[in-house]
A protein has these predicted regions:
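Class I S-adenosyl-L-methionine
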Residues: 1-121
């Protein structure tokens, strides 16, 4: 496994630092007084697998969406994506991964919680 095979076989251990505590998502949660998802992981983790297993425009599905790190990475890598999450609060807060404006983020968060239709562009 330690031999470089030119990418044919991925390594059996990924070394990815967890810098999630400095993320835009958490900053927006704190700014708006919202509790963020407790089990976040670094974007480099889904990025590794999305790049290895999919091509642009492929569909990425995350059945335990949480704060939607996987959806954010899939979007950035030009993949289509679906995310499922039981907690409406986590779904609403996951919009922060795609929004930089505090006022817009607060509005989208409220709309999702009140079952209003919201489009993030």
């Amino acid at each position: 496994w330690s031999k470089n095979n030119g990418g044919a076989i991925p390594p059996n251990m990924l070394q990815i630092p967890n810098t999630e505590s400095n993320s835009h998502y958490l900053k927006m949660c704190k700014l708006l007084g919202i509790k963020g998802h407790p089990a976040r992981f670094p974007a480099a983790l889904p990025e590794f697998f999305i790049k290895m297993l999919t091509d642009e425009s492929d569909l990425v599905v995350d059945i335990f969406g949480g704060s939607n790190t996987t959806g954010m990475v899939a979007e950035r890598l030009k993949r289509r994506w679906l995310t499922f999450e039981l907690s409406k609060e986590y779904v609403a807060a996951s919009a922060f991964r795609f929004i930089s404006n505090e006022t817009v983020a607060s509005d989208i968060y409220s709309k999702i919680l009140s079952d209003e239709f919201a489009i993030i562009e």
